[in-house]
């Protein structure tokens, strides 16, 4: 009898065959599912604590997506030869899984839940992120943990006017869209996408298509749950103390309503903190035991009720705007004197100082990914220090949120970047958030675009981003343009759209409630387009296009092409030639396999000097051309003369002067500079030179004729120090040497 009660479900999903399996591996976890998607295999596990920690006031969900290098048949390249800290892709995929799962846990469920996904095998044409999403959903669904799932997920491409389900990297190279959708059978929960300036209706169609295809996975997971699901937890939300809630409402609602009449974020924050403190003090004065966390949660609920009811009633928002107005915008470029490009983008109380730095090929980011190594010449880094929100906190390496926001901004800008052959620089953009009150990632998109244009990067178009919010109560809803931080915290959706006047370049949506409808997404996209066009108008006013001149502090790139067979000449033995060249000229030189050479320098004269040297190194000697160079070596039969860098030609003794030359040293010395003419070159690159061809012939000089040899001219034999013509006539083949009179003894030749 088998140890395992293995349950397997297999289904065809577009071009992929997918298998879900449970019951054999990781049986001590709360739920474990292996997903095999055409050779990409992931193990998704979930474990939940049986009880919440005392005083816990939030839901502690952690998701860790871990790629094992053995999945691609590799050994880690680190010193310790094992996997280390998460890569950027692992962090982004962990967030991708977390976002659609989090809103499906019931309110009040504060038990710690940990989802861990291991990539065990990787087929590069079947991306592991979709398999990881499906596996995480299935593991939670069979675990019995309180969870209002399962969810499905799908990747959508757009190739030749048609949507494509779960395209691999090869197909994505030809796709105008890379979109991931996740949601329950009823509604969409999460969208993450990058697009090549596509119109809103194509984007919405992609979301709907992806949701429909994701439901195929939902139905299979439900079948798996029916056969392999564990008993549901006997969990009930904590009972509400209605009398205590009424008391807190009575003490705090009026104070909080007054606080939310204040338009300034800092003043409003101080007022709400004061209201919290007064309510806690009043409760303490009554002598009752006060659970601070419980009271603060109730006061937060009051805040949400106030803000949401005002908006749904058509009243002004927190800062006095209506639902469609964008906050005031201020833009300044060339903010920093010695950076290559910079811009300060301010929208209301959100501000981004964005800096662009241009680099060379050596500055590109080399990424050793599981699917293979590649170089990335465009980097976007987002930083938000605690002072941006008037708080204290940890400063150091980027957190998951910062990595995610940087990636979103990068996605928005990639479609408008120039091609490498148009602009060969490596580009690094850093967004420093100096103030934050909502939508700092979209401020980073706007500032990043302006900063690159200030640096002279020839972008195809301006790109702007806007964050939309949602307040939904039953069938009533309001979509908010350019949300504040409080509206984000108290609302139901964070919907970010970036793009040009032509179309959308990036879209990200996170839902806090259990899904939104197609109608709401249509309204949000239309409203976002209106706001985006408004912001783009402001950006064009501030900076109409990319500067034509780069900063004087930016490196200049000079590109030249050489014969690929000459690459080794430029590099030299052990890299000696190119190393000396870079040190002498102070430039950076990069050589590609096709013979393209890129020279980087902040000094144009130095770059030109390097180009000249390379031209000389790779130059071919031209027959009939006169060169000047030093004598590098004296030989018995002539001399070697350096006519080009790394190229010596032979000046034969017979080509030194019109008169007979007995000793080369009578005419030449090592180091002597002479002018010579190229007589000929051969297929091996050997060069024959002449000095006498440039000298005047002496009066009455007659070129000495030399007899032709019977078996063809084998060239000069200068190593004998004289002409072959001085020799006596050669014996005919078979002639015997003159010897004694004939005898009867046969000669050796006669035998």
Swiss-Prot record:
Gene3D superfamilies cross-referenced by the UniProt entry: GHMP Kinase, N-terminal domain (3.30.230.70), K Homology domain, type 1 (3.30.1370.10), Nucleic acid-binding proteins (2.40.50.140)
Domain (KH) ranges: 555-614
Regions of compositional bias (Basic and acidic residues) in chain numbering: 700-735
UniProt binding sites for Mg(2+): 488, 494
A Pfam family the protein falls into: S1
E.C. designation(s): 2.7.7.8
A single BP term in Gene Ontology: RNA processing
Reaction catalysed by this enzyme: RNA(n+1) + phosphate = RNA(n) + a ribonucleoside 5'-diphosphate
Subcellular locations according to the entry: Cytoplasm
Record-annotated S1 motif domain positions: 624-692
Cofactor: Mg(2+)
The keyword Metal-binding belongs to this UniProt entry's keyword annotation: yes
GO cellular component: cytosol
GO molecular function: 3'-5'-RNA exonuclease activity; magnesium ion binding; polyribonucleotide nucleotidyltransferase activity; RNA binding
Keywords of the record: Cytoplasm, Magnesium, Metal-binding, Nucleotidyltransferase, RNA-binding, Transferase
Disordered, as annotated region: 700-751
PANTHER family with a match to the protein in the record: POLYRIBONUCLEOTIDE NUCLEOTIDYLTRANSFERASE (PTHR11252), POLYRIBONUCLEOTIDE NUCLEOTIDYLTRANSFERASE 1, MITOCHONDRIAL (PTHR11252:SF0)
Family designation: Belongs to the polyribonucleotide nucleotidyltransferase family.
Summary of the function given for this chain in its UniProt record: Involved in mRNA degradation. Catalyzes the phosphorolysis of single-stranded polyribonucleotides processively in the 3'- to 5'-direction.
NCBIfam families, per the entry: polynuc_phos (TIGR03591), PRK11824.1 (NF008805)
Protein name per UniProt: Polyribonucleotide nucleotidyltransferase
Species of the source: Methylibium petroleiphilum (strain ATCC BAA-1232 / LMG 22953 / PM1)
Gene responsible for this protein: pnp
């Amino acid at each position: 009898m088998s140890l395992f009660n293995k349950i397997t479900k297999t289904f065809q999903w577009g071009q992929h065959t997918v298998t879900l399996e449970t019951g054999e591996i990781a049986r001590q976890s709360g739920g474990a599912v292996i997903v095999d998607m055409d050779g990409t295999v992931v193990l998704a596990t979930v474990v939940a604590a049986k009880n919440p920690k005392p005083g816990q006031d939030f839901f502690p969900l952690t998701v860790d997506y871990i790629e094992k290098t053995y999945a691609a048949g590799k050994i880690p390249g680190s010193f310790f030869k094992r996997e280390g800290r998460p890569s950027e892709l692992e962090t982004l995929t962990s967030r991708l899984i977390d976002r659609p799962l989090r809103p499906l846990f019931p309110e009040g469920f504060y038990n710690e839940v940990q989802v861990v996904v291991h990539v065990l095998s990787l087929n590069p044409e079947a991306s592991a992120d979709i398999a990881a999403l499906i596996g995480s959903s299935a593991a939670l669904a069979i675990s019995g943990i309180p969870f209002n799932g399962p969810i499905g997920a799908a990747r959508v491409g757009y190739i030749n006017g048609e949507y494509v389900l779960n395209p691999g990297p090869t197909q994505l190279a030809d796709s105008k869209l890379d979109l991931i959708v996740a949601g329950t059978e009823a509604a969409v929960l999460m969208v993450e996408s990058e697009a090549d300036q596509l119109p809103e209706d194509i984007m919405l169609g992609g979301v709907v298509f992806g949701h429909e295809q994701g439901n195929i996975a939902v139905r299979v997971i439900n079948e798996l749950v029916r056969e392999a699901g564990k008993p549901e937890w006997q969990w009930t939300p904590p009972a509400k103390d209605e009398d205590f809630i009424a008391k807190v409402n009575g003490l705090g609602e009026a104070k909080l309503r007054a606080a939310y009449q204040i338009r300034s974020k800092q003043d409003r924050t101080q007022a709400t903190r004061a209201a919290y403190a007064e309510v806690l003090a009043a409760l303490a004065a009554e002598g009752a035991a006060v659970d601070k966390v419980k009271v603060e949660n109730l006061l937060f609920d009051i805040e949400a009720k106030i803000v949401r009811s005002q908006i749904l009633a058509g009243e002004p928002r927190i800062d006095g705007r209506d639902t469609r107005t964008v906050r005031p915008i201020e833009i300044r470029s060339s903010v920093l004197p010695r950076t290559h490009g910079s811009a300060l983008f301010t929208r209301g109380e959100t501000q981004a100082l964005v800096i662009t730095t241009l680099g060379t090929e050596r500055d590109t980011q080399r990424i050793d990914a599981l699917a293979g190594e590649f170089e990335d010449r465009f980097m976007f880094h987002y930083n938000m220090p605690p002072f941006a929100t008037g708080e204290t906190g940890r400063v150091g390496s980027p957190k998951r949120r910062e990595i995610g926001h940087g990636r979103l901004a990068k996605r928005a800008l990639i479609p408008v970047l120039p091609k490498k052959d148009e602009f060969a620089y490596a580009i690094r953009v850093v967004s420093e958030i100096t103030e934050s009150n909502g939508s700092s990632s979209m401020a980073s998109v706007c500032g990043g675009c302006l900063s690159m244009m200030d640096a002279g990067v020839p972008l195809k178009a301006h790109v702007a981003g806007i964050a939309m919010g949602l307040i939904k109560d039953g069938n009533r809803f309001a979509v908010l343009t350019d949300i504040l931080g409080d509206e984000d915290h108290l609302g139901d959706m964070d919907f970010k759209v970036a793009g040009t006047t032509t179309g959308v370049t990036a879209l990200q949506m996170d839902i806090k409630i259990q899904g939104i409808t197609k109608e709401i997404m249509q309204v949000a996209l239309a409203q976002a387009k209106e706001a985006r066009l408004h912001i783009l108008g402001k950006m064009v006013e501030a900076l109409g296009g990319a500067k034509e001149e780069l900063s004087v502090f930016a490196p200049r790139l000079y590109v030249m092409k050489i014969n690929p067979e000459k690459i080794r000449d430029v590099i030299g033995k052990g890299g000696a030639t190119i190393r000396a060249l870079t040190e002498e000229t102070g430039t950076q030189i990069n050589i590609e396999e096709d013979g393209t050479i890129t020279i980087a320098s902040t000094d144009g004269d130095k770059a030109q000097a390097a180009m000249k040297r390379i031209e000389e190194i790779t130059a071919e000697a031209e027959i009939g051309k006169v060169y000047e160079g030093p004598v590098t070596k004296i030989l018995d039969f002539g001399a070697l003369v350096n006519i080009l860098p790394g190229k010596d030609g032979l000046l034969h003794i017979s080509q030194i002067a019109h008169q007979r030359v007995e000793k080369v040293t009578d005419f030449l010395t090592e180091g002597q500079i002479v002018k010579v003419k190229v007589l000929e070159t051969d297929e091996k690159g050997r060069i024959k030179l002449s000095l006498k061809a440039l000298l005047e012939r002496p009066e009455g000089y007659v070129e000495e004729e030399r007899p032709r040899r019977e078996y063809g001219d084998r060239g000069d034999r200068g190593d004998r120090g004289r002409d072959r013509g001085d020799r006596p006539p050669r014996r005919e083949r078979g002639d015997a040497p003159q010897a004694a009179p004939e005898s009867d003894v046969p000669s050796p030749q006669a035998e």
